[in-house]
Amino acid sequence: MYDYIKGQLTKITAKYIVVEANGLGYMITVANPYSFTDCVNQQVTIYLHQVIREDAQLLFGFHSEEEKDVFLKLISVSGIGPTTALAIVAVDDNRGLVNAIDNSDITYLMRFPKIGKKTAQQMVLDLAGKFVEAPKEESSKLPKAKHQENEQLDEAIEALLALGYKATELKKIRAFFEGTSETAEQYIKSALKMLMKG
């Protein structure tokens, strides 16, 4: 098992990033690949969780150990796999998640992609009280960059689709942000907050 990787970030796609270490390029699935935009061709440290399946070996990456810890607790719940847990971590509202679990707010939990009533109830049952302290939000994980708005919005929508959100939900998001100028990372964060509000 791997705990973290240090290396040069060489590629960003809608679903994953590539970090080169010792001559090997590691494909790492992350919640919001565009949050790494300003780190291309720079040294990064990514915290990892490895999933080994019969047909694939996958690496899931995180900005911090706290984010990884939330992910690990989520995948311990029956009915939540790594992809769903990553979509939940992507919302970047860990306080809201912890409060919803501790207060049995099933409606809030069902707003996450692929989380139905049974799974939301299981989350409450398995995780209530497991978060000693709500994870800290990292407001300045990485510096922001300015890019062309349409391209950035397209990349954000593509990343949200990769997280499991439906195209019909994202049509409203696209319409809301048309004419604005943000980075893909900022679009994703804002869109996730809107999607969680319902």
UniProtKB/Swiss-Prot annotation:
User: Which terms does the UniProt entry file under GO BP?
Assistant: DNA recombination; DNA repair
Gene Ontology MF terms: ATP binding; four-way junction DNA binding; four-way junction helicase activity
**Entry keywords, A to Z:** Cytoplasm, DNA damage, DNA recombination, DNA repair, DNA-binding
The record's section on SMART domains has: HhH1 (SM00278)
User: GO cellular component terms?
Assistant: cytoplasm; Holliday junction helicase complex; Holliday junction resolvase complex
Q: InterPro entries in the record, alphabetically?
A: DNA_helicase_Holl-junc_RuvA_I, Hlx-hairpin-Hlx_DNA-bd_motif, NA-bd_OB-fold, RuvA, RuvA_2-like, RuvA_C, RuvA_C_sf
Its localization reads: Cytoplasm
Q: Does the keyword Membrane apply?
A: no
Region Domain II, as annotated, extends over 64-142
What's said on domains? Has three domains with a flexible linker between the domains II and III and assumes an 'L' shape. Domain III is highly mobile and contacts RuvB.
Per its database record, what is this protein's job? Answer: The RuvA-RuvB-RuvC complex processes Holliday junction (HJ) DNA during genetic recombination and DNA repair, while the RuvA-RuvB complex plays an important role in the rescue of blocked DNA replication forks via replication fork reversal (RFR). RuvA specifically binds to HJ cruciform DNA, conferring on it an open structure. The RuvB hexamer acts as an ATP-dependent pump, pulling dsDNA into and through the RuvAB complex. HJ branch migration allows RuvC to scan DNA until it finds its consensus sequence, where it cleaves and resolves the cruciform DNA.
Subunit structure, as described in the record: Homotetramer. Forms an RuvA(8)-RuvB(12)-Holliday junction (HJ) complex. HJ DNA is sandwiched between 2 RuvA tetramers; dsDNA enters through RuvA and exits via RuvB. An RuvB hexamer assembles on each DNA strand where it exits the tetramer. Each RuvB hexamer is contacted by two RuvA subunits (via domain III) on 2 adjacent RuvB subunits; this complex drives branch migration. In the full resolvosome a probable DNA-RuvA(4)-RuvB(12)-RuvC(2) complex forms which resolves the HJ.
Name assigned to this protein? Holliday junction branch migration complex subunit RuvA
Q: Which organism is it from?
A: Streptococcus equi subsp. zooepidemicus (strain MGCS10565)
What is the primary gene name for this protein?
ruvA
